[in-house]
Amino acid sequence: YLQDLNSMMDSWSLERLLCYQILQESFALSASTGSYTIGTGGVFNTARPTKIVDPCFVRDASNLDSPISLINTEAYGRIVQKSAGVTYPSFLYYDQGYSSSGLATIQVYPTPSASLTLFINSWKQLQSFGAISTVIVLPPGYQRAIEFNLCVDLAGGFKSVQPEVA
């Protein structure tokens, strides 16, 4: 049942209404670098985001913030000169494709010409369980929701009892 529980938690991570936290994190952007891996063991070493959402921004050494717009695959593909350098990038593209390492990629455009700090807001995968006895802390209401939905999920594997006709 542990695998069923973790599978359910994994699928819940894709639903905004079930994601109880949008986490803001910051990462160092290096001058002249526009591509960064993100995920456990990546350049941005954090739990791999399920989704990155607005608002995102960069902060310079003077603590001035500049917004960054999220763009999709199509918009990123239309950028002809991806290595153009300016002080502040204007766009962020999150490539969620899975590599063999399980990492995703963040592209910032234009490539910054100075070191900056990137702030992103992301959905994180709901915690999985290492064992049935694993204790996790959840917001109010989640324990019952998990118990109920796991029962519903597991019930499909059992045959229903047919009442006998007298």
What do these predicted ranges mean?
Residues 1-166:
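Glycine-enriched, solvent-exposed interface loops adjoining structured elements
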